[in-house]
Curated annotation (Swiss-Prot):
Cytoplasmic side: 1-250, 716-802
Protein's recorded name: Epithelial sodium channel subunit delta
Extracellular side stretches: 272-694
Function: Potential alternative pore-forming subunit of the epithelial sodium channel (ENaC), capable of replacing the alpha/SCNN1A subunit, creating a more active channel with distinct properties. ENaC functions in epithelial tissues, where it facilitates the electrodiffusion of sodium ions from the extracellular fluid through the apical membrane of cells, with water following osmotically, regulating sodium balance and fluid homeostasis. This subunit could also function independently as a sodium channel or assemble into other tissue-specific heterotrimeric sodium channels.
Gene: SCNN1D
Record note on quaternary structure: Can form an alternative heterotrimeric epithelial sodium channel (ENaC), composed of a delta (SCNN1D), beta (SCNN1B), and gamma (SCNN1G) subunit, where the delta (SCNN1D) subunit replaces the alpha (SCNN1A) subunit.
The family this protein is said to belong to: Belongs to the amiloride-sensitive sodium channel (TC 1.A.6) family. SCNN1D subfamily.
Any one GO molecular function term: sodium channel activity
Positions of glycan attachment: 330, 548
Reactions it catalyzes: Na(+)(in) = Na(+)(out)
Keywords: Cell membrane, Glycoprotein, Ion channel, Ion transport, Membrane, Sodium, Sodium channel, Sodium transport, Transmembrane, Transmembrane helix, Transport
Transmembrane segments: 251-271, 695-715
Distribution of this protein across tissues and organs: Not specifically expressed in epithelial cells.
Organism annotation: Homo sapiens
A single BP term in Gene Ontology: sensory perception of sour taste
Length: 802
């Protein structure tokens, strides 16, 4: 590399280290108070040279006291040289380097550069006068090489002996020894400390460039360029490689932006569907032996309880009056027979005759019939109306009937068989007779005597011959004709340990027929939160079940309604179990309970009560699908011997020839296969990730690692923002104006330990120790060198060509 000559006069560098100039007059120098003007004095003399102003140098081309210097300076009457080539001075601390002298009378400055390509100036570090003994003035040609061994060699003839330089470390910690070394012909120099706080030490010496653990780009442009060049996202590199073509760059930028908008839109739709938690119904078929479910059978003919026979007679009389007034029908027959069976001791009873049947309105050809219910004060009344007169009469009669049953003692129980015979005439399973222990009996106030077939039977094969066969007696003499108009058998199939709610899930079998009930079982598995609202065995349900059975939603709804009625009406409905400490509703104790009950029941039907939300479905339950086929039984040809045979088994004598007094029911499994219906989420976590990956791959060809690259870009951008912001704040802090000192004094005040000796001071020591370099922010530019370049670390030693 050839030296580049400066074409302008430059000021003396302010970071020149104060020290000794060993020469004819043994001079020493220091800075004046402005830190721009040097002052010199002879050792032992108290009179320094005056501070007349900054010393300046002059440019020279080839020759002169410095030979090939780019700029010359005069210090204390001696010419001082600034070299513009990549020469490392002794003692710089920037690596093993050598010192070069141009003559015996010219001190030399060592120069350091950031790189060979950017060597645009020089840095003056330290000057020593005497050259090494092996170098003569006549031997100098101006061309020097740096050999591999680290010592300087000359192209001029003659022997050359290497000499080890002195280093910066010795200058910093042992300034006296360093000055002595320079007197022996070795020069030491040091690069100025890096700008920063005064307490920050200079960077440690390094050999060459070493990559740090974490390195950031210099600017956001460089960061974005690196990302677009190396990212695995498709289309990103087009934003960089097409920079020379603005049309392509703009087009690819718009395409990338459009793809990003489309990706965000589709991801939004995907997450919206996922947050709604949709489910799939997965149906699978399994084949295994199954236990037969329970079957409850009721005769549909409730009995008249003996303690309230008189009350029921009064109710029948009141009902006949209402029907006569509405439809002109005479129902007075049978009153004497009922009066004869009235017991002497009866509970107190009050029949509310204000609640009577009446015509409400005419809607064209349809007549509405109903009754009015009012609260205890009579200020709030409403009509419960029906378009069917039969339904109106039955509901009105049922209301008064339940009001009377509430007067029964809590320990009262009715017999479950009729006096004329048994309800179940025969029972068999798979050709074997049933046992009495396989039946459970109870009395229902509305559906009469009921039997639950509770045999532990496992279905071996499908078909009628492998199921349960029952022959039942159908009683045609109703005890409460206004309460039930049914002539037949009430049947309900339900799971084990479940309460049969006959008013909701039962069906009827008419007399004189054979009904075959085929069962198909479905197992339902529901998902809990967050996909649905279900409970496992009643866990987490706020409602306390009043039935001593397993959890079902219907049992929970009934219990919830009864508890709300006790809280609202101060009494409970008779057809449901009571909570602890409550009593049933009756007009004798609660005159307006009917108004409260029907209001609450209407809210339950319209889902305005909280019972629906309080009673979730079971997460796992068995649902029975029933299909029924009927035929006439017994047939005309077999009726004689069939009825005669059944007469010996308990059929009443007067019913021997009456087909309408019998019914046959077969309960079988339609098939042993059962269906399992399981809910599954539409978007599980793996499916959601798969859908997201498909969309990212469709629009950008990206993967999870591509997303990590984006995350890395965001982290780098955040770190770079903090670094640049910190630099700007530090620059603003150090450039903030300080308080102006006294006139003629410098605003730069080094530390006391680093101040040079005063200009007028005297010392008898012939070799005073040199002070430390003041840690101040000084310009790093001489002949075009930037401040960042002047503080840069060393590069590998290069050869200077002049």
């Amino acid at each position: 590399m050839r030296a580049v000559l400066s074409q302008k006069t430059t000021p003396l560098p302010r970071y020149l280290w104060p020290g000794h100039l060993s020469g004819p007059r043994r001079l020493t120098w220091s800075w004046c108070s402005d830190h721009r003007t040097p002052t010199c004095r002879e050792l032992g003399s108290p009179h320094p040279t005056p501070c007349t102003g900054p010393a300046r140098g002059w440019p020279r081309r080839g020759g002169g006291p410095c030979g090939f210097t780019s700029a010359g300076h005069v210090l204390c009457g001696y010419p001082l040289c600034l070299l513009s080539g990549p020469i490392q001075g002794c003692g710089t601390g920037l690596g093993d380097s050598s010192m070069a002298f141009l003559s015996r009378t010219s001190p030399v400055a060592a120069a350091s550069f950031q790189s060979r390509q950017e060597a645009r100036g020089s840095i003056l570090l330290q000057s020593c006068q005497l050259p090494p003994q092996w170098l003569s003035t006549e031997a100098w040609t101006g061309e020097w090489k740096q050999p591999h061994g680290g010592a300087l060699t000359s192209r001029s003839p003659g022997p050359v002996a290497p000499q080890r330089p002195c280093h910066l470390k010795g200058w910093q910690h042992r300034p006296t020894q360093h000055n002595a070394a320079c007197k022996q012909g070795q020069a030491a120099a040091q690069t100025p400390p890096r700008p920063g706080p005064p307490s920050a030490p200079p960077p440690p010496p390094k050999e060459g460039h070493q990559e740090g653990l974490v390195e950031l780009p210099a600017s956001f442009r460089e960061l974005l360029t690196f990302f677009c060049t190396n990212a695995t996202i498709h289309g990103a590199i087009r934003l960089v490689c097409s920079r020379g073509n603005r049309l392509k760059t703009t087009s690819w930028g718009l395409l990338s932006l459009g793809a990003l908008v489309a990706l965000c839109w589709q991801l939004g739709l995907l997450f919206e569907r996922h947050w709604h938690r949709p489910v799939l119904m997965a149906v699978s078929v399994h084949s295994e032996r199954k236990l037969l479910p329970l079957v409850t059978l009721c005769d549909g003919n409730p009995r008249r309880p003996s303690p309230v026979l008189r009350h029921l007679e009064l109710l029948d009389e009141f009902a006949r009056e209402n029907i006569d007034s509405l439809y002109n029908v005479n129902l007075s027959k049978g009153r004497a027979a009922l009066s004869a069976t009235v017991p002497r001791h009866e509970p107190p009873f009050h029949l509310d005759r204000e609640i009577r049947l009446q015509r409400l309105s005419h809607s064209g050809s349809r007549v509405r019939v109903g009754f009015r219910l009012c609260n205890s004060t009579g200020g709030d009344c409403f009509y419960r109306g029906y378009t069917s007169g039969v339904a109106a009469v039955q509901d009105w009669y049922h209301f008064h009937y339940v009001d009377i049953l509430a007067l029964l003692p809590a320990a009262w129980e009715d017999s479950h068989g009729s006096q004329d015979g048994h309800f179940v005439l025969s029972c068999s399973y798979d050709g074997l007779d049933c046992q009495a222990r396989q039946f459970r009996t109870f009395h229902h106030p509305t559906y009469g005597s009921c039997y639950t077939v509770d045999g532990v039977w496992t279905a071996q094969r499908p078909g009628i011959t492998h199921g349960v066969g029952l022959v039942l007696r159908v009683e045609q003499q109703p005890h409460l004709p206004l309460l039930s108009t049914l002539a037949g058998i009430r049947v309900m199939v339900h799971g084990r340990n479940h309460t049969p709610f006959l008013g909701h899930h039962s069906f009827s079998v008419r007399p004189g027929t054979e009904a075959t009930i085929s069962i198909r079982e479905d197992e339902v598995h529901r998902l809990g939160s967050p996909y649905g609202h279900c409970t496992a065995g009643g866990e987490g349900v706020e409602v306390e079940l009043l039935h001593n059975t397993s959890y079902t939603r219907q049992a929970c709804l009934v219990s919830c309604f009864q508890q709300l009625m006790v809280e609202t009406c101060s009494c409970g409905y008779y057809l449901h179990p009571l909570p602890a400490g409550a009593e049933y509703c009756s007009s004798a104790r609660h005159p307006a309970w009917g108004h409260c009950f029907y209001r609450l029941y209407q809210d339950l039907e319209t889902h305005r009560l909280p019972c629906t939300s309080r009673c979730p479905r079971p997460c796992r339950e068995s649902a029975f699908k029933l299909s029924t086929g009927t035929s006439r039984w017994p047939s005309a040809k077999s009726a004689g011997w069939t009825l005669a045979t059944l007469g010996e088994q308990g059929l009443p004598h007067q019913s021997h020839r009456q087909r309408s007094s019998l019914a046959k029911i077969n309960i079988v499994y339609q098939e042993l296969n059962y269906r399992s219906v399981e809910e599954a989420p539409v978007y599980s976590v793996p499916q959601l990730l798969s859908a997201m990956g498909s969309l990212c791959s469709l629009w950008f060809g990206a993967s999870v690692l591509s997303l990590l690259e984006l995350l890395e870009l965001l982290l780098d951008a955040s770190a770079l923002t903090l670094v640049l912001g910190g630099r700007r704040l530090r620059r603003a802090w150090f450039s903030w104006p300080r308080a102006s000192p006294a006139s003629g004094a410098s605003s730069i005040k080094p530390e006391a330990s680093q101040m040079p000796p005063p200009a007028g001071g005297t010392s008898d020591d012939p070799e005073p120790s040199g002070p430390h370099l003041p840690r101040v922010m000084l310009p790093g530019v001489l002949a075009g060198v930037s401040a960042e370049e002047s503080w840069a670390g060393p590069q590998p030693l290069e050869t200077l060509d002049t």
